[in-house]
């Protein structure tokens, strides 16, 4: 599933194709996953923003917003393909949403209403914004259960999925099964989250071996070339040379260097 770096890369690259453009209409698969799109036909896009893994489309002279979730394999393209699910007609051309596994969702809501949606209501702060405060994170981490599922819950901070949780934990030297982090651990993890996500956004996200994520211009992301743990099972840890191990935690494949990331607490 696209995580914060992939969604932010998508937002930045499609913004010039949509901002300032008037929506002339949509063509989309008959599906409950695309809701009330007709309500924004005729409106002009003012701004694309992001909340966690969601893209938010605002409009001029309207209180409506379009909420887009990419799902497992969703993405925008400049040209259609066999997996195109939504075609957006604008006054300057078309934009295409592709989604091979059909888990993406689009929904038009009243402005601000997205914050009350079940999947968005309990979201934590944005990791690359001013609302992600060290002291708040340290205090929450001191009470947290198993750290990786805690990160994936989106409550302490938004946008981390399997890839960037593994990478952040490796960089901070924290075992994914650790819990109730010390202040020193939490400070390292806080810094690692910001560093990993910043680098991943700058690299255009991660394109894995299945190739499901591509940037809107058709190029892959490149951060997978910098992965230190994720997807490196049995390969040497770039830090110490010990083999990266993979195990399952909370139903998620988890990658760890047990030398660099010793389990400190039962």
Go through each PLM region and give its residues.
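Intrinsic-disorder/low-complexity coil detector
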Residues: 1, 79, 124-126, 215, ...
């Amino acid at each position: 599933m696209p995580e914060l770096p992939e969604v932010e890369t998508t937002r930045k690259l499609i913004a010039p194709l949509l901002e300032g453009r008037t929506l002339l209409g949509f063509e989309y698969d008959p599906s409950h996953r695309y809701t009330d799109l007709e309500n924004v036909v005729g409106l002009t896009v003012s701004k694309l923003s992001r909340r966690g893994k969601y893209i938010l489309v605002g409009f001029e002279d309207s209180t409506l917003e379009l909420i887009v979730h990419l799902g497992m394999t969703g993405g925008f393209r400049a040209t259609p393909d066999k997996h195109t699910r939504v075609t957006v007609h604008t006054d300057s051309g078309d934009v295409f949403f592709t989604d091979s596994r059909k888990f993406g969702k689009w929904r038009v809501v009243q402005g601000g209403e997205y914050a009350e949606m079940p999947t968005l209501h309990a979201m934590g702060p944005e990791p690359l914004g001013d609302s992600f405060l060290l002291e708040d994170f340290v205090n929450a981490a001191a009470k947290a259960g198993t750290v990786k599922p805690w990160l994936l819950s989106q409550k302490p901070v938004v946008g981390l999925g399997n890839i960037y949780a593994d990478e952040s934990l490796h960089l901070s030297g924290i075992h994914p099964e650790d819990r109730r982090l010390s202040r020193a651990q939490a400070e390292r993890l806080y810094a690692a989250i910001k560093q990993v996500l910043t680098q991943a956004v700058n690299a255009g996200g991660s394109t894995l071996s299945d190739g499901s994520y591509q940037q809107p211009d058709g190029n892959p992301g490149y951060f997978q070339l910098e992965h230190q743990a994720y997807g490196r099972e049995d390969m040497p840890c770039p830090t110490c040379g010990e083999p990266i191990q993979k195990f399952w935690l909370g139903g998620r494949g988890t990658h760890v260097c047990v030398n660099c990331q010793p389990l400190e607490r039962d």
